[in-house]
From Swiss-Prot:
Organism taxonomic ancestry: Bacteria, Bacillati, Chloroflexota, Dehalococcoidia, Dehalococcoidales
Protein family per UniProt: Belongs to the universal ribosomal protein uS11 family.
Summary of the function given for this chain in its UniProt record: Located on the platform of the 30S subunit, it bridges several disparate RNA helices of the 16S rRNA. Forms part of the Shine-Dalgarno cleft in the 70S ribosome.
Listed GO CC annotations: ribonucleoprotein complex; ribosome
Name listed for the protein in its UniProt record: Small ribosomal subunit protein uS11
Coiled-coil features, chain-numbered ranges: none
Amino acid sequence: MAVKKRAGAKKKEKKVIPVGKAYVQATFNNTIVTLTDLQGNVIAWASCGTAGFKGSRKGTPYAAQMAAQTAARKAAESGLRQVEVLVKGPGSGREAAIRSLQASGINVTAIRDVTPIPHNGCRPPKRRRV
């Protein structure tokens, strides 16, 4: 019995994208790193959860460092060499993620803080009493 090849099935071509943006969303519980081209199409992404951390360990700077490293490795395969970093959120993984992106061989041209600041919008959650 001869095995038929599927008609129309083509291998997905990888586009070489040298310049892009890196979005780092750092919350208190997790850090998500997304690498995109200049139009905003996602090239690679990683979070502390996908890097193998669970629970409260996802909020640590080391977890953010590993997540950024994973995302940078995936993006380097697509040819990403230069990024502008946009950081959002108050989490502890902000600086660690940026340092990890620089250490992985990606050239960081600019770092911008795009954390949304309310003009007295929603009421914040009540204080924790431990």
